Swiss-Prot record:
It comes from the Eukaryota. This is Exocyst complex component exo70. The exocyst complex is composed of sec3, sec5, sec6, sec8, sec10, sec15, exo70 and exo84. The modification Phosphoserine is found at S2, S418.
Length: 615
């Protein structure tokens, strides 16, 4: 088939093609229009987004401006009352107002400042930082004022504690710090710290203030009872306790009463964990004070004479009391202080054991060091007896002798020494050994001095009588047997006889083979006259010399002078009276006043004057 269908309709095809081209053009135009519209729509959409952002930004800026205005308003309020608060802080230091009033005022001001600080802390305003710094400074100043007021209040409690120092060492009554209303006060400040100050990084520092004042108070109480100042009048029970005791003993027992009181008060004011943490901080200064003093005294005790260390025997008792108090009164354990006490006990035991040995070997059994005196007894003699008395008195010290062993105090032990069946026997042997050896040492030392002569009897008699009296009036008597007391009595009699020899020598001048005859000797030969003159002369010289020495330097122990005066009168006066009666009317001299210096009554008074200083 030639051509095709379009060959037959060529005109129609052309028309169709034209129409198709026209439609295509219309479609292209429509597409362009649509593209243009799309572009315009895209532009409108972008403009709408910008507009939406602008609206959002506007709203945000408006909100920020509003918030800023509010912050500025708050800042203005804070600025307006800061001067008022500052003035209030100054008034809180007004001494004319009560401490409680000032305390309430400063707490109110601090609460207001803390609120201001919290407000400023979240402020977005850059210039608010300066205001915050100002508030910080005022908070710091207010906390210092609060701390000072707390210090004053706690000092009041400390002062009332010092008023109780008089009963601290009266072991018959319990002792505690006066803390009425203290718990309420401390609780108030602690709650204020937690609610107001801690959130703004501030504090009243109440715990450290309490630690400082309580620590100082404990030290002051120690000084008060150990120094026994006029400001502190100890009651009778405390006076009885401190009498005759060293500072170490007093301080240890005082601490054993103070430390439990501190611990108990801490548990009243704080929880147990806090109380145990604060306790060592409070008591450390006092314990250090006692520790340092004790260490220094240990060196003194080691160098001191053995007899002087008798006071340490009471320390053994005090250490026992200290341990008992710490075990019975402490609400929680203080192992450190108990360790210190036990250490002191061990050290003092060593010193005492050494002193027990040195008292015998270095003092009693040493004739080179014993003092020789006719003025009653020496300080050394007093010291020996005080040591022996304390040793017998303190039952807690008896184990010291037991640790030494029977006769263990001697450098050399003889086979014939008496055995011991008990600590009491050891104590008895030690006491008697010390007294016997001391008397022997004094006698040996006196015999080596030519000028002592009859005065040796005075020395030994004074010591012997003193020993005997002290044994009988003390607990030593419970350790001794009858044979021991008889031995002391025999020694006193022996030394009395030794002393009386000088008076017998005086009275020897009055002996006369004819004195027993009743008649007076009216006429005498020349030889008899000279003998009689010599007798009167010797008697006068001797008795005057003896009486003069007695007046100047002889002093007898209580009771000895009365006894000896009677013995002397019985020895001298009868012979003199007979001699006087026999020759008063004789012709042995024309100048009787020269030879007969004493009437019978005068001689009695003259001899009495020798003993008067001791009566």
């Amino acid at each position: 088939m030639s051509g095709g269908i379009f060959d037959d309709n060529k005109a129609g095809f052309e028309t169709f093609q034209k129409n198709l081209n026209s439609v295509a053009k219309n479609v292209s135009d429509a597409s362009n229009i649509l593209l243009s519209m799309d572009k315009r729509l895209s532009g409108l959409e972008a403009s709408a987004g910008i507009l939406r952002d602008d609206v959002t930004n506007y709203n945000r800026v408006s909100s920020n401006i509003y918030d800023t205005l509010k912050e500025m308003e708050s800042l203005q309020v804070i600025h307006s009352h800061l001067p008022v608060l500052q003035k209030g802080l100054q008034e809180c230091q007004n001494l004319n107002k009560s401490v409680s009033q000032n305390l309430k005022s400063v707490m109110d001001i601090l609460k207001s400042l803390a609120e201001d600080y919290t407000s400023l802390e979240g402020s977005p305003l850059q210039f608010a930082s300066k205001s915050q710094q100002k508030v910080e400074m005022m908070l710091s100043e207010g906390c210092q004022i609060l701390g000072a007021l707390c210090y004053n209040i706690l000092e009041t409690y400390a002062a009332s504690s010092l008023n109780k120092a008089s009963t601290l060492l009266d072991l018959s009554i319990p002792w505690s710090f006066p803390n009425e209303s203290l718990q309420q006060f401390i609780g108030l400040i602690q709650q204020f710290d937690a609610d107001v100050l801690f959130p703004v990084s501030c504090s009243s520092d109440i715990s450290n203030i309490y630690i400082k004042i309580k620590g100082e108070c404990v030290v002051k109480l120690l000084h008060a009872v150990s120094m026994r100042t006029d400001e502190i009048k100890l009651n009778e029970g405390s006076v009885n306790f401190v009498t005759g005791k060293e500072d170490v003993s007093i301080n240890l027992v005082a601490l054993s009463r103070l430390l439990p009181a501190v611990a108990s008060e801490l548990l009243l004011l704080f929880d147990q964990v806090t109380a145990k943490a604060l306790y060592p901080k409070i008591v450390k200064p006092a314990i250090n004070t006692v520790t340092n003093a004790t260490r220094q005294l240990e060196g003194v005790y080691e160098k001191r004479g053995a007899a002087e260390n008798f006071v340490l025997l009471s320390l053994i008792d005090c250490i026992v009391v200290t341990r008992q108090n710490m075990n019975n009164l402490m609400p929680f354990e203080d192992a450190s202080f108990l360790g210190f006490v036990n250490g002191v006990g061990r050290e003092m035991e060593k010193i005492l054991i050494s002193s027990i040995s040195r008292l015998y070997n270095g003092t009693c059994h040493n004739n080179k060091t014993v003092p020789l005196t006719t003025d009653r007894v020496s300080e050394m003699t007093h010291g020996i007896m005080s040591f022996l008395n304390e040793l017998a008195e303190h039952e807690n010290a008896s184990y010291l002798l037991e640790s030494i062993g029977n006769w263990g105090w001697r450098h050399e032990i003889n086979a014939d020494l008496s055995p011991a069946r008990s600590v009491q026997d050891i104590t008895r042997n030690y006491v008697m050994d010390c007294m016997d050896s001391y008397l022997t040492s004094v006698q040996t030392a006196a015999q080596a001095v030519d000028t002592i002569g009859w005065k040796m009897g005075v020395m030994l008699l004074n010591i012997s009588v003193y020993f005997e009296a002290k044994c009988l009036e003390s607990k030593i008597a419970s350790f001794l047997q009858d044979v021991d007391l008889e031995k002391l009595g025999d020694r006193s009699q022996k030394y009395s006889t030794m002393y009386m020899e000088v008076w017998r020598q005086c009275s020897q001048n009055m002996l006369d083979s004819t004195y027993t005859k009743s008649q007076n000797k009216s006429t005498m030969s020349a030889k008899e006259r000279e003998i009689t003159k010599e007798k009167f002369r010797n008697f006068n010289e001797q008795v005057t010399s003896v009486v003069q020495v007695h007046r100047e330097s002889v002093r007898f122990e209580t009771g000895v002078a009365t006894f000896l005066l009677q013995e002397v009168k019985k020895t001298v006066l009868p012979l003199y009276q007979r001699f006087y009666d026999k020759y008063i009317n004789s012709d042995f001299t024309k100048n009787k006043d020269k030879y007969i210096k004493f009437t019978k009554a005068d001689l009695d008074s003259f001899i009495t004057s020798a003993f008067a200083p001791s009566l």
